[in-house]
Amino acid sequence: MWRTVILALALLAMLTIGCVNPRSSAGFRLPDGDAERGKAAFLELKCYNCHTVSGVDLAVRGKEYAYLRSVVLGGETRRVRTYGELVTSIINPSHSLAPGYPKELITKDGKSAMADFNDTLTVHQLIDLVTFLQSHYQLVPPEIPGS
């Protein structure tokens, strides 16, 4: 219980003193993280059971869950995935389900089947995990018809 309260207060403090991501026109920014530690957190938290990261060989032996599809993170995108969006997707995965989200990963009440890691995920893991994931998105300019 206290760990949850401390984590919530730490996140609230960081949110209130955070600044806008210089690469984005909206959102907030936590301190810089470490992508390698983020990859380690991805493996430690067993995110690979439901997710793959575009262009990353995670070298895991097997998944504990046999979902038909993995949710792919990273890769080419036509819009910027802001720091704030990635943080929100981790701490509140049901906030906004992406178009094309696998139906087998949506609960009967319309929420994400993603486990709640708020009681186990540390702030440092969150910062590093977001840094790791954000580094694997590539912005692709939208196609303009007739050009």
Range-by-range predicted roles:
Residues 43-49, 54, 125:
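Short pre-active-site segment immediately N-terminal to redox-active cysteine/selenocysteine motifs
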Residues 47, 94-98, 138:
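Generic structural signal for secondary-structure transition and capping sites
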Residues 1-6:
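Bacterial N-terminal signal peptides that target proteins for export
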